[in-house]
UniProtKB/Swiss-Prot annotation:
InterPro entries: Restrct_endonuc-II-like (IPR011335), tRNA_endonuc-like_dom_sf (IPR011856), UPF0102_YraN-like (IPR003509)
Protein's name in the database: UPF0102 protein Noca_3248
PANTHER family the record matches: UPF0102 PROTEIN YRAN
Gene3D superfamilies for the chain: 3.40.1350.10
Record CDD domains: PoNe_Nuclease
GO molecular-function terms, A-Z: nucleic acid binding
Pfam families in the cross-refs: UPF0102 (PF02021)
Family: Belongs to the UPF0102 family.
Length: 124
C-alpha cells in the first residue's frame, strides 16, 4: 500500500469516527455547533453545547488496539492544547459561555462486528 493510500484510509476512518461521535453526542441531547474548526494553532474535532456548558470533543478512532486504545492517544499536552483552542473558539465566535468541558470519544471499528463508542466527559 502506498503512503497516499494509507493516508486516505486513515482520513476516511477519522471522518467516519467524527460522524459516529457527533451522532452519539447529539443522541445524548447535546447540540452540535461546529465540526473540524481550525485555526493556525490547531483543530477542534467537534464543538457542542451540553445545556449551558460548551463542550470541545476530541475524537479518536482506531481500527484495532494494536497501537493502544484511543484514550491512550490523548496526552496531557493534547488536553492543554484543546483548552487553548476552546478559548480561541469562544473568542473567535464571540459567544459567552459559563463553562468549558473537554470530552473524548474513543471509537474502535474492527474489521468485523460493530464499532464500539466510549464517551468520557471532562478529561481535563
Amino acid at each position: 500500500m502506498t503512503s497516499s493510500a494509507a493516508a486516505a484510509i486513515k482520513q476516511a476512518l477519522g471522518a467516519y469516527g467524527e460522524t459516529l461521535a457527533a451522532r452519539h453526542l447529539v443522541g445524548q441531547g447535546m447540540v452540535l455547533l461546529e465540526r473540524n474548526w481550525r485555526c493556525e494553532a490547531g483543530e477542534i474535532d467537534l464543538v457542542l453545547r451540553d445545556g449551558d456548558v460548551l463542550v470541545v470533543c476530541e475524537v479518536k478512532t482506531r481500527s484495532s488496539l494494536r497501537y493502544g486504545t484511543p484514550h491512550e492517544a490523548v496526552t496531557d499536552i493534547k488536553v492543554a492544547r484543546l483548552r487553548r483552542l476552546a478559548s480561541r473558539w469562544v473568542q473567535d465566535r464571540g459567544v459567552a459561555v459559563r463553562d468549558i468541558r473537554i470530552d473524548l470519544v474513543g471509537i474502535v471499528r474492527p474489521r468485523r462486528g460493530s464499532s464500539v463508542v466510549d464517551h468520557v466527559r471532562g478529561i481535563g
